[in-house]
From Swiss-Prot:
Its EC number is 2.5.1.78. The active site is at H89. It holds the Pfam family DMRL_synthase. GO terms for molecular function: 6,7-dimethyl-8-ribityllumazine synthase activity. InterPro entries: LS, LS/RS, LS/RS_sf. Gene3D superfamilies: Lumazine/riboflavin synthase. Forms an icosahedral capsid composed of 60 subunits, arranged as a dodecamer of pentamers. One of its GO terms (biological process) is riboflavin biosynthetic process. This is 6,7-dimethyl-8-ribityllumazine synthase. GO terms for cellular component: cytosol; riboflavin synthase complex. Catalyzes the formation of 6,7-dimethyl-8-ribityllumazine by condensation of 5-amino-6-(D-ribitylamino)uracil with 3,4-dihydroxy-2-butanone 4-phosphate. This is the penultimate step in the biosynthesis of riboflavin.
Length: 156
């Protein structure tokens, strides 16, 4: 039986992070977690990490698509936070962001990982950006690293 498992060390990987500026008080922590995981665990040098800031989560799919199509990166990580408010805006932004990133990922030849928080409250977002529930930015980075190696193994 052949078994393919990814490892998270990818010292030569070139990784782009697309991050939303809206809710940056949360997103800064997601970015910190992602960069820490890439450098410390994945052994990716800071010179091989590109961070692209966009206005909000709605702009992430187009930006990620452009990064994928540039052929400069081995993986792209999307980071952002959408917090439910009193209107239907949350559903539109969260749904379109998720759907758009999923579409880009399925059309891509490289890993596209989802580090976008969709929460009911600011407290839930804070918990997922480095306190009680870990750091979803770091998790998205680890997933990107592992998937780089899984896809390399599959392609031979």
């Amino acid at each position: 039986m052949n078994v393919i498992k990814g490892v998270v060390a990818a010292p030569n990987a070139r990784v782009a992070i697309a991050i939303a500026r809206f809710n940056n008080f949360i997103n800064d922590s997601l970015l910190e977690g992602a960069v820490d995981a890439l450098e410390r665990i994945g052994q990716v040098s800071s010179e091989n990490i590109t961070v692209v800031w966009v206005p909000g989560a709605y702009e992430l799919p187009l930006t990620v698509k452009a990064l994928v199509e540039s052929d400069k990166y081995d993986a792209v990580i999307a980071l952002g936070t959408v917090i439910r408010g009193g209107t239907a805006h949350f559903e539109y932004v969260a749904g379109e962001c998720s759907s758009g990133l999923s579409h880009v990922a399925m059309q891509s030849e490289i890993p596209v990982t989802f580090g976008v928080l969709t929460t009911e409250s600011i407290e839930q977002a804070i918990e997922r950006a480095g306190t009680k529930a870990g750091n979803k930015g770091a998790e998205a980075a680890m997933t990107a690293l592992e998937m780089i190696n899984v896809l390399k193994a599959i392609k031979g």
